[in-house]
From Swiss-Prot:
GO molecular-function terms, A-Z: ATP binding; ATP hydrolysis activity; catalytic activity, acting on DNA; DNA binding; nuclease activity; RNA binding; RNA helicase activity
Organism from which the protein derives: Methanocaldococcus jannaschii (strain ATCC 43067 / DSM 2661 / JAL-1 / JCM 10045 / NBRC 100440) (Methanococcus jannaschii)
Database matches in SMART domains: DEXDc, ERCC4, HELICc, HhH1
Motif (DEAH box): 137-140
InterPro entries per UniProt: ERCC4_domain (IPR006166), Hef_ID (IPR041755), Helicase/UvrB_N (IPR006935), Helicase_ATP-bd (IPR014001), Helicase_C-like (IPR001650), Hlx-hairpin-Hlx_DNA-bd_motif (IPR003583), P-loop_NTPase (IPR027417), Restrct_endonuc-II-like (IPR011335)
GO biological process: DNA repair
Keywords per UniProt: ATP-binding, Helicase, Hydrolase, Nucleotide-binding, RNA-binding
Swiss-Prot/TrEMBL catalytic activity: ATP + H2O = ADP + phosphate + H(+)
Protein name according to UniProt: Putative ATP-dependent RNA helicase MJ1505
Enzyme class of the recorded protein, top EC level: hydrolase
Assigned EC number: 3.6.4.13
Amino acid sequence: MFIEHPLIKPKTLEARLYQQIIAANALKKKTLCVLSTGLGKTAIAILVIAGILTKKDGKVLILAPSRPLVEQHYNRLKQVLNIDEDKIIALTGKIQPKKRAELYKKGKIFIATPQVIENDIIAGRINVDEFILLIADEAHHTTGDHAYAFVAKKFKDKCHILGLTASPGSDIDKVMEICENLGIEHVEVRTEDDEDVKPYIAKVKLIPIRIDLPNEFKRALKLINEALKERLKILKDAGVINSIADVTKTELIELNNKLFSYDEEVKYELIKVCSEALKLMHAKELLESQGKSVFLNYINKLSMQRTKSAKSIVNDEKVREAVNLLMKSDVEHPKLGKVVDMVKNILEKNKDERIIIFAQYRDTVEKIVNLLTQNGIKAIRFIGQANKEGKGMSQKEQIEAIERFKKEGSVLVSTSVSEEGIDIPSVNYIIFYEPVPSEIRFIQRRGRAMRGEGGKVYVLIAKGTADEAYYRSALYKEREMKRLLKNMCYLLNKRLQKKFEEKSKEEIKEETEEIKEKEIESKTAVKEETKEEEEKTKKPVTILDFIKQIEVKERSKSEEDKIKQEIKIPKKPIKIIVDVREKNMAKLLHNYANIELKTLEVGDYVLSDRVVVERKTAEDFVNSIIDKRLFSQLKNLKKVEKPLLIVEGENFSRLHENALKGAILSIILDFGIPIIFTKNAEETADLLIKIAEKEQIKEKRTVMVRYGKTAMSLKEQQKFIVESLPDVGGALAERLLKHFKTVENVFTAKEEELMKVEGVGKERAKKIREVLTAEYEG
């Protein structure tokens, strides 16, 4: 059976009762839908879109976390929805911002990554009021500072909401945060244990495969462990940890943060030792779980770092011995050979079988793909976009990789980028190169095998290593999440109901107070009207008075209608150019200024044609002094006419007080750059707005990037020349040019003529003429 609906093409969407029930409930309230992988979250989204658009006229936005997933939703909606295909639009960062602004006017349904929508909200390219539905696919991302959360908060009070996820997590407070950010009023949950979904769930068998490490690895790991224990002993002797046994990375990260509050005499050495211990622990895990090449790459990266902790590890005798031992050995991690053997065995039984291998690191993905290819197996790489090292796949390459895998590939070797939502049908075998401690990622990886007829999931575990702990952790968290999901509907809906009842009480209270205020205003107005009427009765009413009354009523009505038609996003009086890397600050600023995101060569914020601001957090300020980046950045900042440095926060504890004072004095005296300290991001934003207002409103200066390749327009050049005159700012330069028409006329004008311009007194006119006529003494 198929769904029959005027907005859904015939025989394109299978009719499943549980999907229809969930969609019907989701149309009544803002809903978070938690549905196991393979149960058709996209189908529910389509049913809700069709339902909403049948009742209301407006636009729909679907958020998806990756570009390939955006493309997938786009193709599926075009295939199923009975809507003009030109009205269904996929938006990515590849489309120019101006073009996106035009597309928002033309389209009906938009599919985009949250980062694109976030940028367009900040820059004022999208009108949120035009949307009647927001669908957040993979809604578990709607937490913290994620772009999902920013977009959700902008939309939740404006339109209907549907959140979709297979794995919201095992912490009910985190799930409540997701609900809060999306404005969720109701939760729908279905797991593989629910009777109405059981017929559609594929059975998956989880098979752990434990692998012994080679002797060369064990000897190298022993040396790294000894180096690690030396650091942990220092921390224990200092009394900051209780034992050197079973210390976790999480505990060391927490300790590192605590150490900043310790006395100056001891904290720097302890922070260094703690940082070394963390790096050694990470190196150890890489060798245990990933292999020799990934471990050696990490040590090589440390050798290129300037920090004391990195140098200490690279120069450590035991670490050097471990590195030499591995470099001389031809042995690689036995997981690699095991993967090749497993793939061969599966394909020998069925040459048309499809297999997905998940590996956490890109280096490991490359290694696996190369090994499989050498063994005559068609392996396709699937990784995320370019990172700091420049490696990665473009959106086009990702989509092509999925299509190749569907048509001709036997094995897809992937990082976590393919865990979410990518439609790869009929996959019966999954191999985890390593276990992941996150229950969300564990479920999503395994879920790739729940879409076909069911299958097997193999997890490779290096015996006696962190792999064992991560595997146990993932299983425990998954059990906890399932337990939570069973009670989630009841618990969450109860919490949400309580929350909305409290909100309603508050709203009723506010409304009551508002009504009382209006009653008082109304009584006052009635008294005044009565008084006016009494006065009018004293005068005879003429036909002219009657006509005037009708004209006033008609005019006020037509003006009201005109206002309703012309309501748009209010234009903000100032503009700020913000560097693309400063997006969090742009989020704070966009409510008060028009924001243009741009890659800036110098500084972080352009507030006018002469003021450019570099912003640093206290931590970054300290780090940039230590690694000597700061002074090269300040040399660049000197390119602008009026540079400014803002340092935000109060945590300067990593740097000695004398060194900090010396750096501040050098910035002010040697570089001539003013420095302002702020407590937090909000205070910084307020300061930036005030400077921009002064420059643009009071001084009437334009906002432009004056350094680099950008050339000034003729008008800007004229203004720039006139501003060079004594006591002439941006506003006065503009008045002089408007009065005299040309720069030449300004420069040849006599004192009396200059004084005719507002703001030019006798003294100022005299100074201007003196500069223009005095002989140059070379």
